[in-house]
Structures are given as C-alpha cells and as structure tokens.
UniProtKB/Swiss-Prot annotation:
Component of the large ribosomal subunit (LSU). Mature yeast ribosomes consist of a small (40S) and a large (60S) subunit. The 40S small subunit contains 1 molecule of ribosomal RNA (18S rRNA) and 33 different proteins (encoded by 57 genes). The large 60S subunit contains 3 rRNA molecules (25S, 5.8S and 5S rRNA) and 46 different proteins (encoded by 81 genes). It comes from Saccharomyces cerevisiae (strain ATCC 204508 / S288c). GO terms for cellular component: cytosol; cytosolic large ribosomal subunit. GO terms for biological process: cytoplasmic translation; response to antibiotic; response to cycloheximide. Component of the ribosome, a large ribonucleoprotein complex responsible for the synthesis of proteins in the cell. The small ribosomal subunit (SSU) binds messenger RNAs (mRNAs) and translates the encoded message by selecting cognate aminoacyl-transfer RNA (tRNA) molecules. The large subunit (LSU) contains the ribosomal catalytic site termed the peptidyl transferase center (PTC), which catalyzes the formation of peptide bonds, thereby polymerizing the amino acids delivered by tRNAs into a polypeptide chain. Present with 13600 molecules/cell in log phase SD medium. Transmembrane segments: none annotated. This is Large ribosomal subunit protein eL42A.
Length: 106
C-alpha cells in the first residue's frame, strides 16, 4: 500500500521559480485516444470492408500492475511536472497516516 500526501515541497523547474516550492499532487490519467491520429485512421481504413481482423490482437499480457505517475503542479507558477513511482497494487492519495501497531485496512 503506497500512501502519498496531496501536497509536497519539491524543486520547481519553472522559469519564474527555479527553487523548492509547494506542489499539488494528483495522479496522472491517460487522455482519450484521438480518432484522427494517423495510426488510428490507417487502422480504421484497413479494418473496413470484408476480411475480418487485419492486425494481430495482443494476448500475452505479462504485467499485473502499472507504474504510478504523479502530476506535480507548482502552487506559485502553475508549472506541471510528472514523477514516476514504482509499481504497486494499492495506491492512495492523501490517505490517513498509519499509526503504530494497527492492522492494515484496504
């Protein structure tokens, strides 16, 4: 279980800051894939008509988790940076700190 606080003081690369400032932490989420990207247009054109599936469908999935990516936004200059964490099954943002001698809760 990885628990990350919602704010963190870290270095800001922004042109106005260039020093350690407070950052707001959120979890990165991939955007919606565009229908007009060249590869998608080509794939849709190839798929249309008769002939079934034209490209291999991936089945050999090996990983059980994804790496967690944090999005750090500077409170002062709004510059955003991304930070990759290690793989984990349970990720929590801004959860309660755990006390000594207590059982884990999911």
């Amino acid at each position: 279980m990885v628990n990350v606080p919602k704010t963190r003081k870290t270095y800001c690369k922004g042109k106005t800051c260039r020093k350690h400032t407070q950052h707001k932490v959120t979890q990165y989420k991939a955007g919606k894939a565009s229908l007009f990207a060249q590869g998608k247009r080509r794939y849709d054109r190839k798929q249309s008509g008769f002939g079934g599936q034209t490209k291999p469908v991936f089945h050999k999935k090996a990983k059980t988790t994804k790496k967690v990516v944090l999005r750090l936004e500077c409170v002062k200059c709004k510059t955003r940076a991304q930070l990759t964490l290690k793989r984990c099954k349970h990720f929590e943002l801004g959860g309660e700190k755990k006390q000594k001698g207590q059982a884990l809760q999911f």
